[in-house]
């Protein structure tokens, strides 16, 4: 049964961000198998904010992941997974869009030949099944640079993040798989004094599908996703209505992928009509990986171009090093253009 479990879980969880594996403490709790991962990142950046100023910034991040599971006599795998991560901005003058974030995931799951069900706080299928520009280490155009300058690419549809939901993921059948999720409410920054930063959406639904086929040693994949939710009238924001279509090519160590994303006016206050095209490539080795990606974003008030390159290297089982260089140009409809860059470095300790 362990071989069946490994095959099934790997087939139902396509990685979207390529990163070298972290170490984990594995142990048994009676009939249950458990693993615990502790991770800490120290990050520094040198950046030009696009208005003629250069500065430095730094962040300290930490993450704890815990997984507890059991294989039943029926062949089902059942378990509980929890994750908590926190990011601390060590510079009070740096307040990028992703600084001081807290992300919680906790959900129960069951998997078998019929597929996989997850219930709790977890990313939905619009995120996990969507193909797009690959990411390595710090993420390139959808990465940590956005803590310091500009804003990140979406890569896929506007999804319900890790808000509470029920998820079903089908097993792969002839290279095809699909997923669906439903959640009663989505609450992000609902107490923020700035109403523009509040997200209060109800009845969020995600639908996603993916198809992969091998052709002469090359694996070709396509994906599609759709997300809808109903905005709370008190916020005066728009409903979430977003979709994306992506593709990926895999050949040995090479990954090439891209996507078109339509976010429309999703959760916007005054209408944004946002669309994005992203494209990238990655080369993945056992101890190191590199990637390059680019994105063009159009919305009612802004045209944004992003380009980035980065890599990661596993020093040993406990230490990895990552670096990114990302450049941006923000062309505002009602203002001057801004161009700048961010150079980031990071050391990660894992146990």
Where do the PLM segments sit?
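Residues that define the transmembrane beta-barrel architecture of outer-membrane proteins
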Residues: 53-62, 101-104, 160-164, 201-205, ...
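Cleavable N-terminal export/targeting peptides
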Residues: 1-29
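Repeated loop/turn-to-beta-strand initiation elements of outer-membrane beta-barrel proteins
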Residues: 74-78, 114-118, 175-178, 215-222, ...
């Amino acid at each position: 049964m362990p071989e069946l479990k490994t095959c099934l879980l790997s087939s139902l969880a396509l990685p979207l961000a390529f990163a070298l594996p972290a170490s984990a403490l594995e142990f048994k709790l009676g009939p249950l198998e458990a693993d615990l991962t502790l991770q800490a990142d120290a990050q520094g950046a040198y950046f030009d904010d696009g208005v003629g100023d250069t500065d430095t910034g730094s962040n300290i991040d930490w993450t704890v992941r815990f997984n507890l599971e059991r294989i039943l006599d029926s062949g089902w795998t059942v378990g509980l997974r929890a994750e908590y991560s926190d990011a601390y901005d060590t510079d009070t003058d740096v307040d990028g869009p992703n600084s001081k974030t807290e992300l919680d995931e906790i959900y129960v799951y069951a998997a078998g030949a019929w597929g996989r069900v997850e219930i709790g706080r977890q990313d939905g299928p619009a995120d996990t099944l969507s193909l797009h520009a690959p990411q390595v280490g710090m993420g390139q155009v959808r990465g940590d640079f956005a803590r310091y300058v500009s804003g990140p690419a979406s890569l896929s549809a506007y999804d319900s993040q890790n808000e509470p939901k029920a998820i079903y993921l089908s097993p792969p059948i002839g290279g095809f798989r699909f997923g669906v999720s439903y959640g009663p409410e989505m609450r992000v920054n609902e107490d923020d004094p700035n109403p523009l930063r509040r997200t209060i959406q109800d009845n969020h639904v995600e639908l996603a599908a993916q198809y992969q086929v091998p052709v002469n040693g090359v694996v070709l994949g396509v994906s599609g996703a759709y997300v809808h939710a109903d905005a709370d009238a008190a916020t005066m924001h728009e409903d979430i209505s977003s979709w994306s279509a992506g593709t990926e090519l895999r050949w040995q160590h090479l990954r090439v992928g891209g996507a078109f994303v339509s976010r429309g006016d999703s959760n916007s206050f005054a209408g944004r009509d946002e669309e994005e095209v992203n494209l990238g490539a990655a080369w993945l080795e056992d101890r190191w990986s590199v990637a390059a990606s680019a994105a063009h974003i159009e919305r009612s008030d802004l045209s944004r171009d992003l380009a980035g390159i980065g890599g990661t290297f596993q020093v040993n089982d406990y230490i990895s090093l990552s670096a990114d260089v990302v450049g941006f140009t923000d062309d505002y409809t009602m203002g001057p253009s801004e161009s700048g860059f961010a150079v980031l470095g990071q050391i990660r300790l894992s146990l």
